[in-house]
Amino acid sequence: MISIKFSKTIPKGLILFCFFSGIVNFTMAQEMIPLWPDGKMPNSKGLHLPDSIAKGFLFSTTSPRIYAFPAAKENNTGAAVLIVPGGGYLRLPSDYSKNATALFYQSKGINAFVLCHRLPDSKDLIHPEKAPLQDAQRAMRIIRANASRWSIDPDRVGVAGTSAGGHVASTLGTHQEDVSTIGDSLDQYSFKPTFMILVSGVISFKEAIVHKGSRDRLIGSNPSTEMVRNYSNENQVTKETPTTLLIHGDNDKTVPSLNSLVFYQALHAAGVPASIHIFPYGGHGYTVNKNPGTATMWPSIAMEWLKEMKMIPE
C-alpha cells in the first residue's frame, strides 16, 4: 500500500484510489492528485525543479497534477469534465482552490477536474510540444480509472478548455497517437474525451488566424510546415472526433473567432455533431460569469447542450 500526501483540503472521508500500478489509500480531505509516479513521467530529463510562481501565475512545473472538485452525492449527474485553463502556453493559474469554472460545473452536478500541465519552456522537457498532451491524456486515464470512486460514467467524461487551454483540449480530442503510456495499470483506460467545450479556443496555427504566442511557445518561432499542419487541429478532425461546443467572441482580438469557425467547418464536414455560438462582444476568454450582453448566456447554453447530447440528465 502506497501512501500519498496531498496539499489541499476539502470536506470528509476516505476513499481508495486505484493509482499508478497499485492501489493507493488517500483521504478525500485532499484534492490535489499527481499525474505521474516518481521516475515514470514521460518526456522528462529527470530534473526536480520547484514550481516557478510570480504574481499569481505558475510559469513552470515539473509536478503536473489535477485538482478534483467531485460533485455532491445528491446531485451527481455521473458526468465529468477535465478543465484546461488558458495562458498562452506561457503560464497557468497558481491557485486552483477556487477555480470558478470548476465550481460552476460542480454546482451543476458535474465532477470537475482542473489540469495543471507542464509548460513547453520547462528545462526538464525533451520534446516540449508533447508535454501538455501527455499530461492531458494521463489525466483522462486517472479520471476513468477511478470512475466508480466518484460515481462517474466513463462514457461521459469530456474536456473543457479556454484560450490556449482550448488548444490542449482540442489536441486531446483530435490527435490519435497515444503519447502517455508508461507500462502501468492506467494504460488500459481511454484518454479520448466524450465531448469538448472550447471557449475562445486556440485551434489553428496557420498564419492568417494564429495566436502567435501560443504557437511560438509550443512548437517554436520557426516551425516546419509539417509541425504547423499537425498542431492546427482542424486538420486532425475525423468522424471519430468527439461532439463539440464552440463559444467565441466576434471581437476577440487575441484569438480570432475564425479559430472556432474553421474547427466547426471541419467537424461539420466529418459529420461530427457540433454547435457554435459567436457572440458580438466580450473580447477574449469568457468566464462563467460577468460576460457582457448576450455572451452572459453561454454557461446556460453549455448546460442545455450537454443535455441535448445526453451527457447529463434533462
Predicted regions and their residues:
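N-terminal cap/lid segment of alpha/beta-hydrolase-fold proteins
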Residues: 30-75
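Mobile cap/lid helix-loop segments that gate and shape the active-site cleft of serine hydrolases
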Residues: 53, 201-236, 242
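C-terminal catalytic histidine-bearing segment of alpha/beta-hydrolase fold enzymes
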Residues: 261-314
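Primarily recognizes the serine-hydrolase "nucleophile elbow" in alpha/beta-hydrolase
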Residues: 138-210, 228
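Short beta-strand/loop motif that positions the catalytic acidic residue
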Residues: 246-248, 252
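Conserved alpha/beta-hydrolase "acid-adjacent" motif
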Residues: 253-259
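Catalytic nucleophile-loop/oxyanion-hole region of alpha/beta-hydrolase
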Residues: 93-94, 99-101, 117-154, 292-296
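Short beta-strand element of the alpha/beta-hydrolase
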Residues: 77-86
